[in-house]
Design a protein with these regions (language model features):
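Nucleotide/phosphate-binding sheet-loop regions of phosphoryl- and nucleotidyl-transfer enzymes
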Residues: 1-389, 416, 422-425, 432-437, ...
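Short beta->alpha connector loops at strand-helix junctions that form conserved
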Residues: 41, 448-450, 469-472, 560, ...
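Conserved alpha/beta-domain cores
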Residues: 93, 517, 527-878
Length: 878
């Protein structure tokens, strides 16, 4: 029996999203529960994968099944594809298993040609509608299938409106639209070299192929990387009978949410346009009306829609994002999905759904994307500064937050200015999916057109970016990179501030303050902490960082980088003296100047942590990073050392390395200069003793971490220095104190010999930044030059420095955990690379049995939630 690549909506259900994609599975589910859905079928994600395996061709087997299901649709609808008597028109939409709003391409009104449009015009008695559908189809097909840019057609529309003296597309007559369709086809022929296709089946296969192709377009690739959506998933294609919202004033189209996606409030929020097609709302071309006004225009359809909203939310137990069309007063549902929402809304909805009995606490914790918590910690406008400011304009508060920066008018400029370290606000007439990289680079987005459900608003909410849309008072001049608002002209580089909660726009920069964490945040985090087994620590070198991390729920310091403490002005001079010393005695004299500073730093950290664990990594970077580079500083050092400038320069030159990442650094420094390790040990132990004396009820157990071990004898050598020094300090103080000595596991050889290393270590901590560099054999600082090409070639899907490589690096980690614990059952194991704040990496750490992850302070909530989700999923999956 042939493999099944196509399913009628009536053959699927919501559990088949891996095969049918999210949109197809939900269309099937809505069909099954009796909602008014235009009939159609779904071409599976497997067909998309097969398309790529067959060299970007749709094979004969899949083509035959598509044609078979077109015939089934004809039977169901009583219409025929490409027929002149009763033509069937369809939409072709993408639908991956994970929602990707605005990332993929859609075609409406497929099946039209010059003859069919004349039949429709005559039979419907509505020629304007028929020609409007045809000109839209030509434009969409040209853009999506043949890659002729929309802009060429927009110019023709603008010229026609100017010629006819009208402002809106809906004011153009049937004759105007017929003329436009002719112009569009001429434009197509000029760009492509052939006539616009008139055969319905040829159109359909071109459209299906285009949707498959769009899975690999640049904006889809960017969105997938940002949202951890694997390339291998592919997209499904939904072919659906058209419902027309553009037949006249008793028709319309809209998008709605069962709850407010910006705040989470339990009230329907949405927008609709009369005499329009679906893409008009989400594309943000016209600014739509609030959904409540639909009650006046289409009272019966509105009443039915309110009931549908209730049915869908009760069915899916989550906030729904729905697309619908009203044709001649009759409601048709085109889509439902779990709606994108801001982080504050996600928390509010999750807490409310538990209170309403829709979700358990476990399910509520699983609802929230940990990465979105980041946005809760973003700055807000200072209340006093905001009160003193007067808005110069107002739009729709489409995605909350505060954004201020310099104005730019294109996504490319936003990226370029951001790369130069400038904060920018991207101002656009209307946002298109191609702007995604610019939206990522900008602090916030301001659009002239579009509503709360436009592409800009939906994607901004998903990214946690502040967005104000639909500020129609702006007179935009994109060509000259300026706009006028409230009588003032703003040029590229001028500063504005926007408030994504209120929709207000302000001249200049308004002071921002750190966000306050809401009660819902505390509730969700409380639930998360109940379920997780993985501890979450922080990477912190200063008391301020440590305090902030504790505020956000950190349970200790997993990495304190001591080298950062050497760079301060009052101690760098002494450290440079140490580097340029000739003997161990001279080095010790210089290090003794630094000792009280280091001790003071550690005491402050112990105070900030109040007895929680503090893991201190000994000096790691190569010495050349600490030496002076300017002539003046070199002369000052020579004077302090009483050495000629030439000798100091020779010492500095001697520190130069061809590959410093793999050079004289980490434990190699401690082997060469054991006095450095001895000084740092004294500082750690003395600080701990003083803290313990001040706070006898605190459990102060210093953790000393020796970096870059690749050979067990290195660890034994440096540990011997540490233990002798520490024991002598403890004995001299006359106290009893426990301490631990462990190592960073960041060299592949350390993973391979973890069994031996574990016998001599109290703990392991994976330094996954270096472990990734050394396993792949490329530098984190240089990888950016070629990773883009690797993404394009599908060699990598993600940056291995941001998302842990579980296949290679992960295999080494798993081996080190298993071999380490087999030889030292008490071994405590954590991770302190950047991966400690990445949700998928945190899940991997849970699954291989780590005790803790450590991440930067502001990523602590992300890791807490990710750890809880990992524990819940592991329990559910047995």
């Amino acid at each position: 029996m042939a493999h099944k690549y196509v399913y009628l909506f009536s053959e699927g259900n919501a559990n088949m999203r891996n095969l049918l994609g999210g949109k197809g599975a939900n269309l099937a589910e809505m069909t099954n529960i009796g909602l008014p859905v235009p009939q159609g079928f779904t071409i599976t994600t497997e067909a998309c994968t097969q398309y790529y395996e067959d060299g970007r061709q749709i094979n004969a087997e899949i083509t035959a099944q598509i044609m078979e299901y077109i015939e089934k649709m004809e039977e169901i609808t009583g219409k025929k594809f490409g027929d002149l008597e009763n033509p069937l028109l369809v939409s072709v939409r993408s639908g991956a298993r994970a929602s990707m709003p605005g990332m993929m391409d859609t075609i409406l009104n497929l099946g039209l040609n010059e003859q069919v449009v004349e039949v429709l015009a005559e039979k419907s008695g509505n020629p304007r509608w028929a020609w409007d559908c045809y000109r839209r189809f030509i434009q969409m097909y040209s853009d999506v299938v043949m890659e002729v840019g929309k802009k060429y057609f927009e110019v023709l529309i603008d010229q026609m409106k100017e010629k006819k003296g009208v402002k809106l597309d809906v004011e153009l007559t049937a004759e105007d639209l017929k003329e436009l369709a002719g112009q569009f086809k001429a434009e197509y022929k000029e760009k492509i070299g052939t006539d616009f296709p008139s055969d319905a089946k040829e159109q359909l296969m071109g459209a299906v192929k285009a949707v498959f192709r769009s899975w690999d377009n640049p904006r889809a690739n960017v969105y997938r990387r940002d949202n951890d959506i694997p390339y291998s998933w592919g997209t499904a294609v939904n072919v659906q009978a058209m419902a027309f919202g553009n037949m006249g004033d008793d028709c319309g189209t809209g998008v709605a949410f069962t709850r407010d996606p910006a705040t989470g409030e339990k009230k329907m929020m949405g927008e609709f346009l009369t005499n329009a097609q679906g893409e008009d709302v989400v594309a943000g071309v016209r600014t739509p009306m609030p959904i409540a006004q639909m009650a006046e225009k289409f009272p019966e359809a509105y009443e039915q829609f309110v009931k549908v909203c209730e049915i869908l939310e009760n069915h899916y137990h989550d906030m729904q994002d729905m697309e619908f069309t009203v044709e001649k007063g009759k409601l048709f549902m085109l889509q439902t999905r779990n709606g994108k929402r801001t982080a504050p809304a996600a928390l509010q909805i999750a807490v409310d759904l538990v209170a309403e009995g829709h979700k358990t606490e476990e399910e509520a914790v699983l609802m929230i994307d940990p990465r979105n918590l980041d946005t809760l910690l973003h700055p807000q406008f200072d209340a006093k500064a905001l009160k003193a400011a007067t808005p110069v304009g107002h739009g729709l508060g489409a995605s909350p937050g505060a954004a201020c920066g310099q104005i730019v008018f294109s996504a490319e400029d936003a990226e370029r200015w951001n790369a130069d370290g400038k904060k920018v606000v991207l101002v656009r007439l209307e946002n298109s999916p191609e702007d995604i990289t610019g939206m990522k680079a900008a602090q916030g987005i301001l659009t002239v057109r579009g509503g709360m459900t436009s592409h800009a608003a939906v994607v901004a909410r998903g990214m946690g970016k502040c967005c104000v849309s639909g500020c129609g008072d702006i007179a935009m001049d994109e060509e000259n990179k300026e706009f006028t608002l409230a009588g003032k002209t703003y040029h590229e580089g001028d500063c504005i501030s926007i408030d994504g909660s209120t929709g207000n726009i302000y001249d200049g920069l308004i002071k921002t303050v750190d966000a306050e964490i809401s009660g819902n945040f505390g509730t969700i985090m409380g639930w998360a902490d109940k379920f997780r087994t993985l501890k979450v620590r922080t990477n912190a070198d200063t008391p301020a960082d440590a305090r902030k991390a504790r505020e956000l729920g950190a349970e200790g310091i997993g990495l304190c980088r001591t080298e950062h403490m050497f760079f301060e002005a009052d101690r760098i001079a002494a450290f440079r003296e140490m580097i340029c010393s000739d003997t161990a005695t001279e080095r010790e004299i210089a290090l003794n100047k630094i000792l009280p500073y280091q001790q003071g730093d550690f005491e402050q950290l112990y105070e900030a942590l109040e007895g929680m664990p503090v893991c201190i990594r000994f000096l790691d970077p190569p010495l050349h990073e600490f030496v002076p580079t300017s002539e003046y500083e070199i002369e000052q050092l020579a004077k302090a050392q009483q050495k000629p400038v030439s000798e100091i320069k020779a010492i500095i030159q001697g520190l130069h390395e061809f590959n410093p990442m793999m050079g004289h650094r980490g434990c190699r420094l401690a082997v060469t200069y054991p006095e450095i390790a001895a000084m740092q040990t004294k500082a750690v132990i003395r600080a701990a003793i003083n803290t313990m004396k001040k706070h006898p009820d605190w459990n102060v157990v210093p953790e000393i971490m020796i970096p870059l071990i690749g050979e067990v004898k290195e660890l034994k050598y440096v540990k011997d220095v540490v233990v002798k020094t520490a024991d002598a300090e403890i004995a001299a103080a006359g106290v009893e104190m426990q301490y631990q000595v462990g190592t960073m596991i960041e060299i592949p050889r350390a993973c391979l010999t973890a069994d031996e290393i574990a016998k001599n270590a109290d703990f392991f901590c994976f330094g996954t930044n270096d472990l990734t560099q050394m396993t792949f054999g490329f530098s984190r600082d240089d990888a950016g030059k070629f990773l883009g090409a690797y993404y394009d070639a599908k060699i990598f899907e993600n940056d291995p420095f941001a998302k842990l490589d579980q296949t290679g690096v992960g295999k080494l980690m798993r081996m080190a955990v298993n071999d380490g614990r087999a030889n030292n059952p008490k071994l405590h194991i954590g991770i302190c690379g950047e991966h400690g704040g990445d949700p998928s990496s945190v899940e991997f750490c849970h699954n291989i049995g780590l005790d803790y992850v450590s991440c930067s302070p502001f990523r602590v909530p992300i890791s807490r939630l990710a750890a809880a989700q990992a524990a819940i999923n592991a329990k559910r999956n047995g």
